[in-house]
Amino acid sequence: WCRTDPTCTAVGVERRADRAANARANAENLTAPGQFTVIDHDLTEGLPDGLPTPDAVFIGGGATAELVDACLARLPQGGRIVVHGVTMEAETLVVDLSGRLGGELMRFSVENADHIGRLRGWKPARTVVAWSWVKG
């Protein structure tokens, strides 16, 4: 997102200090100064104060109905939300959201070649479920 145009900005919220540090390092290497801000915060405690009104929201893991509802309430008309997850709970959540609100629901998986003794086989990664919706 930030790399598409120098005027684009993004805010990341991360509860784990190591992941927040990694996000900051990536931002320093991949975006212009000030384009990407990381806030250290546990979203199970609600959204942090002072967030700008989003054009889009991406939840990459740890989604709950309460978090999605809080994000939907802040999302303006025409804003997009995308929720990804790999757990059965996340899949249940996005299937419910898709049933209630519509949007696009998909699952995708990746397999990598790996050794099985002297032979090789496919080793699957966790399947990702994704839901995307635009507030109309």
Where are these regions (language model features)?
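Short beta-strand element of Class I
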Residues: 7-11
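S-adenosyl-L-methionine
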Residues: 13-56
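Aromatic pocket-lining residues of Rossmann-like dinucleotide-binding sites
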Residues: 1-2
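Conserved active-site and cofactor/substrate-binding residues in soluble primary-metabolism enzymes
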Residues: 14-18, 22, 66, 89, ...
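Helix-to-beta-strand junctions that scaffold the AdoMet/dcAdoMet cofactor pocket
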Residues: 5, 32, 75-77
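Short, ordered loop/turn segments at secondary-structure junctions
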Residues: 15-17, 43, 62, 86-88, ...
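C-terminal substrate-binding/active-site "lid" region of AdoMet-derived donor-dependent transferases
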Residues: 68-132
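Active-site segment flanking the S-adenosylmethionine/decSAM binding pocket
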Residues: 39-82
